[in-house]
From Swiss-Prot:
GO cellular component terms listed in the entry, alphabetical order: extracellular region
First-level EC class: hydrolase
Keyword Lipid metabolism attached: no
Taxonomic lineage from the root: Eukaryota, Fungi, Dikarya, Ascomycota, Pezizomycotina
Organism whose genome encodes this protein: Aspergillus terreus (strain NIH 2624 / FGSC A1156)
SUPFAM superfamilies given in the database record: alpha/beta-Hydrolases
Sequence intervals crossing the membrane: none
Gene3D superfamilies in alphabetical order: alpha/beta hydrolase
Pfam families: Cutinase
Residues marked Transition state stabilizer (site): S53, Q133
Gene Ontology BP term (one): carbohydrate catabolic process
Protein name: Probable cutinase 5
Signal peptide: 1-18
Length: 220
């Protein structure tokens, strides 16, 4: 486990150094939070997203905010509210090595966001997504939601699904046809390892695909 942890940290550092973010792009990525639910905004569709390990904000820049923006483009911004999972979900590296590929505090935090959507926006349809460790957070959370909430979750997208092998490409106790797993060629976390390759950082490219899937699962 220590060797894997070291390899994961080294890989993150190597990829970051090899691909420095230009200043204009870095500026654009400052918008990495979405708190519509917390701010009391209810719209026909609510997207709940859990970011990947080490990402800043509560949505992250690689898959979370791009998916939120693409879904707003697909359905109209007036129809989509976005909420990231923050708080106790700190997106730190160590929980990846636990049996659930995340920790219980993160799962409880995400569960609370789904409960918030259910109580504050009872007429909204819920869609969800997660990237990297965030995909494990969503997997573990959604499978144990009470049916009254789970039945409102119309679709889920999982990018770089760290439990893809363990859970056979699906979320247990949730309809497979309502789940889209997006795994890039060469992303080794999708085949049961925690080795980070450059492919694991490419999911911004898949945000439109993910948004189209989620849009097809709801009616507005």
């Amino acid at each position: 486990m220590v060797a894997l942890h070291t390899l994961l940290l080294t890989a993150f550092a190597a990829v970051s150094l090899a691909n420095p973010i230009p200043a204009p792009e870095l500026e654009a990525r400052q918008i990495i939070n979405a708190n519509d639910l917390e701010n009391g905004v209810c719209k026909p569709v609510v997207l709940i997203f859990a970011r990947g390990s080490t990402e800043l904000g509560n949505m992250g820049a690689i898959a979370g905010m791009p998916t939120c923006n693409a879904l707003k483009l697909a359905l109209g911004s007036q129809n989509v509210a976005c909420q990231g999972v923050g708080g106790a979900y700190t997106a730190s590296l160590i929980p990846n090595f636990l049996p659930a590929n995340t920790n219980q505090a993160s799962i409880r935090e995400a569960t609370g966001v789904f409960e918030m959507a259910h109580t504050r926006c009872p007429n909204s349809q819920i869609v969800a997504g997660g990237y990297s460790q965030g995909s494990a957070v969503m997997d573990n959370t959604i499978q144990d939601l009470p049916d009254v909430i789970k039945n409102k979750v119309k679709g889920v997208v999982l990018f770089g699904f760290t439990r893809n092998l363990q859970d056979l490409g699906r979320i247990p106790n949730y309809p497979k046809e309502q789940t889209k797993v997006i795994c890039a060629v060469g992303d080794l976390v999708c085949v049961g390892t925690l080795i980070i390759t450059p492919a694991h950082l490419t999911y911004t490219l898949n945000a439109p695909e993910a948004a189209q899937f989620l849009a097809s699962m709801v009616s507005v």
